[in-house]
Regions:
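Amphipathic, hydrophobic secondary-structure cores in small proteins
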Residues: 4-61
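Short, leucine/isoleucine-rich alpha-helical interaction segments at C-terminal helix-coil junctions
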Residues: 60, 64-68
Length: 77
């Protein structure tokens, strides 16, 4: 079941509905980047083109967690 949250993106309020797992992953990625969740979503919003924002967030999260990990990164994980 999707969870709806309201975020302020560049001064505009918007609502976004994602599965709890995607919210958790987006929050984790934002934290790793030293960003707020809103700043993380805004970065995605600025590059999504005509794609639905919720879909763009899901794709960004999925792309991060399915990207190949270098051997050096694996050694320190």
């Amino acid at each position: 079941m999707n969870v709806k949250r309201s975020l302020s993106l560049a001064g505009h309020r918007t609502s976004l509905a994602l599965e709890p797992e995607f919210w958790a992953a987006a929050e984790r990625l934002a934290g790793e980047r030293g960003q707020s969740l809103a700043a993380f979503v805004l970065d995605i919003d600025r590059t999504r083109g005509d794609r639905n924002l919720a879909s763009a967030v899901r794709v960004a999260v999925l792309a991060h967690f399915t990207a190949p990990v270098s051997l050096a990164e694996r050694a320190y994980s």
